[in-house]
Amino acid sequence: MFSKKWIIVALGAVSLPAFAAVENYTVDPDHTYPSLEMTHMGLSVWRGKFNKSSGKITLDRAAKTGNVEIVVDAASIDFGHEKMHEHAVSADWLNVEKFPTMNYKGAIKFKGDMPASVDGQLTLHGVTKPVTLKINSFKCMPHPMLKKEVCGADAEGDLDRADFGMTKYTDGGAGKIHMRIQVEAIKQD
């Protein structure tokens, strides 16, 4: 009888990690803005952001794993300059008529107890390539108005437009893109 109790306790302890909750979050489109920086003919740095994005994030903090899926409306790019917008959405660059969205799917990597990076695949302009994002900050807290946990992060990474088949106007360093992503996501019940 004594050994039977210990077997039950041991099995229960071993199975506890299997019941660790995977937490699901929905990206808050009002507080999430993928943005980019690139040179304008090597003269200055232009900054733009995408105003429409959606997605989901999963976190398993006990297992120190997670996943990210983000969809960005390519036509929502905003440089604050109409001519630049027209050029960016044209066939010369994003070609939003043919490729209306950009998709990023990746696995979150932890360093200690905190997410540190996302190793993922970006589909842009019909081409899928690996892109790693470094997470510079990450925090979760109960949101005072939503009464739910909300997590926020700032991440960054680099890509070359030519890798995605966008080779027009890449001289002068304009092909190199530095991305910055601010994201907030709301925990789902």
Task: Describe these PLM feature segments.
Residues 2-19:
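Gram-negative bacterial Sec-dependent N-terminal signal peptides
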Residues 20-189:
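Low-complexity, acidic/polar, glycine-enriched regions of mature
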